[in-house]
UniProtKB/Swiss-Prot annotation:
Spans through the membrane: 208-235
Cytoplasmic side, ranges: 236-287
GO process terms (BP): cell morphogenesis; epithelial cell differentiation; kidney development; potassium ion homeostasis; sodium ion homeostasis; urea transport; urinary bladder development; water transport
Region annotation (Disordered) ranges: 243-287
Subcellular location as annotated: Endoplasmic reticulum membrane
Endpoints of the signal sequence: 1-18
Transmembrane in keyword set: yes
UniProt protein name: Uroplakin-3a
Length: 287
């Protein structure tokens, strides 16, 4: 049903006059959380500028953004010669002093749009979203990168009212061919104060409480286990030293030494009789 509604909305865009059209927020079918604190997703002007007849030549669509003010509905995005403005986010203080060019993309012909029936296909979802949507404020690094050369689309300011406008530019002449009206004011989300965040455990489920308790006590058990491992290692080292000392004492006692003589004692060598006894024994044999 939502896909049929989206197709019907695109068909209605073809029936309307270009001067009466405004940029619109993306449908919840494509962007569920929109706007965010720093981004706004808009529907691209599909079948808007070429609704009456196909365009011949090379065209691009420029998207301009500015902070809402009393005069923002009448602000022009081109000079007196019809050349579109090239002002940047930095030059306009984030759109507060005037409109800046937030995005630029090729104009896709109506007949070349991807089918919305495949929006549920994960492999084609990114392509379809890029074809139908443009997101303002999705580049968080270009503003702080001094070497960035492309079109910078920095994050928007939270809780701020913005307006947007599409401009069709003929790339052959570099002049504005057509443009939409400024959009209605669109607010970015407001950050939730810390005091408003509900931290009462009574509103949490039983599973959340159990998981939180386990995670909270896990460091204590790890610390106890680590301390026990250190103590056991010291105990094992002490018992090993005692055994080595006992063995060395037994070895020393097993090798006695004769007092009053300098002859070394070898416990493992079978020594013969003394020299005087050997001489007596040999004399008896001769007799």
């Amino acid at each position: 049903m939502l896909l049929l509604w989206a197709l019907l909305a695109l068909g209605c865009l073809r029936c309307g006059w270009t001067v009466n059209l405004q940029p619109q927020l993306a449908s919840v079918t494509f962007a569920t959380n929109n706007p965010t604190l720093t981004t706004v997703a808009l529907e691209k002007p599909l079948c808007m500028f070429d609704s009456s007849e196909p365009l011949s030549g090379s065209y691009e669509v420029y998207l301009y953004a500015m902070v809402d003010s009393a005069m923002s509905r009448n602000v022009s995005v081109q000079d007196s010669a019809g050349v579109p403005l090239s002002t940047t986010f930095r030059q306009t203080q984030g759109g507060r002093s005037g409109p800046y060019k937030a995005a630029a993309f090729d104009l896709t012909p109506c007949g070349d749009l991807p089918s919305l029936d495949a929006v549920g296909d994960v492999t084609q979802a990114s392509e379809i979203l890029n074809a139908y949507l443009v997101r303002v404020g999705n580049n968080g690094t270009c503003f702080w990168d001094p070497n960035f050369q492309g079109l910078c689309n920095p994050p928007l300011t939270a809780a701020t009212e913005y307006r947007f406008k599409y401009v069709l530019v003929n790339m052959s002449t570099g002049l504005v061919q057509d443009q939409t009206l400024w959009s209605d004011p669109i607010w970015t989300n407001r950050p939730i104060p810390y005091s408003a965040i509900d931290t009462w455990p009574g509103r949490r489920s039983g599973g959340m409480i159990v998981i939180t308790s386990i995670l909270g006590s896990l460091p204590f058990f790890l610390l106890v286990g680590f301390a026990g491992a250190i103590i056991l290692s010291f105990v094992d080292m002490g018992s090993s030293d005692g055994e080595m000392t006992h063995d060395s004492q037994i070895t020393q006692e097993a090798v006695p030494k004769t007092l009053g003589t300098s002859e070394p004692s070898y416990s493992s060598v079978n020594r013969g009789p003394p020299l005087d006894r050997a001489e007596v024994f040999s004399s008896k044999l001769q007799d």
